């Protein structure tokens, strides 16, 4: 049986692999093989069809911790969430260390969460049936603005802000090393894309020079078509 891999990608604040190069793959002129990709994209939160989400077929290779990507084709999911397209690929790419990736991306209305939901599937050999009846999972997008208000006079060592939306996987959004750095950065607002219609948890940790710390945990329910605002006073 030819190997095809479904990928549940874990996103962390500092990614192990970084996309170094992304470009359009050249049109195949020799050693071509035809491959069809079809399936559907759903909103994982509601198990309903997701319209207008980009699905891409790409060559990917990791070199020294960086990825090289050549996009072969991209289509958007239809009103019923489906996608179906056929591409000619240069099969010699497999012998050059590339694998073939079918992945879903974010759109104006949806975001991808690599730590929750299938967003990519791969094949490392030419297999015309590798990308049949695939289902990708995305989440409805909501916009959240964190407003930072430095009003206290305490002298902290570091101040970290993180958020979580589905589960307890926290993404770090901001970390400063001193009160003065807040002023130096001149950062008063942080814009976040989060999941709509669920409670986004906001966690702050203030650490002092003596090793003690204080933690706050709160949440806000964000909706689509508007920007929710959460004020952080520290």
Q: Model-derived features: where do they sit?
A:
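Post-signal-peptide N-terminal segment of Sec-exported extracytoplasmic proteins
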Residues: 36-82
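Short, acidic Ser/Thr/Gly-rich low-complexity loop/linker segments typical of extracellular
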Residues: 64-88, 170-185
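Extracellular beta-sheet/turn segments enriched in Thr/Pro/Gly and aliphatic residues
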Residues: 27, 115-145, 213-234
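Short Pro-Gly-centered beta-turn/loop motif in secreted/extracellular proteins
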Residues: 79-99, 180-203
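Beta-strand-rich domain onsets/edges
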Residues: 21-36, 40-45, 130-141
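A short, solvent-exposed loop/turn motif at the edges and junctions
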Residues: 90-127, 206-215
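Sec-dependent bacterial lipoprotein signal peptides
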Residues: 1-22
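Short, ordered, surface-exposed loop/turn motifs in non-cytosolic proteins
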Residues: 46-65, 152-172
């Amino acid at each position: 049986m030819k190997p095809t891999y479904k990928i549940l990608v874990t996103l962390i604040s500092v990614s192990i692999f970084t996309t170094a190069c992304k470009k359009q793959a050249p049109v195949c002129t020799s050693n071509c093989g035809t491959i069809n990709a079809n399936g559907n994209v759903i909103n994982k939160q509601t198990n309903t069809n997701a319209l207008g989400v980009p699905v891409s077929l790409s060559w990917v290779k990791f070199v020294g911790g960086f990825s090289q990507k050549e996009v072969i084709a991209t289509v958007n999911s239809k009103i019923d969430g489906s996608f179906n397209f056929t591409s000619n690929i240069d099969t010699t790419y497999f012998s050059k260390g590339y694998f073939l990736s079918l992945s879903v991306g974010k759109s104006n209305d949806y975001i991808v969460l690599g730590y929750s939901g299938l967003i990519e599937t791969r094949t490392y050999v030419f297999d015309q049936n590798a990308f049949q009846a695939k289902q990708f999972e995305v989440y409805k997008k909501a916009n959240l603005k964190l407003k930072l208000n430095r009003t206290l006079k305490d002298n902290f060592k570091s101040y970290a802000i993180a958020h979580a939306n589905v589960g307890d996987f926290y993404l770090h959004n901001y970390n400063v090393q001193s009160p003065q750095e807040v002023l130096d950065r001149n950062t008063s607002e942080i814009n976040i894309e989060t999941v709509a219609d669920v409670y986004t948890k906001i966690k702050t940790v203030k650490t002092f020079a003596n090793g003690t710390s204080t933690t706050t945990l709160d949440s806000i329910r964000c909706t689509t078509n508007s920007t929710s605002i959460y004020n952080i006073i520290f």
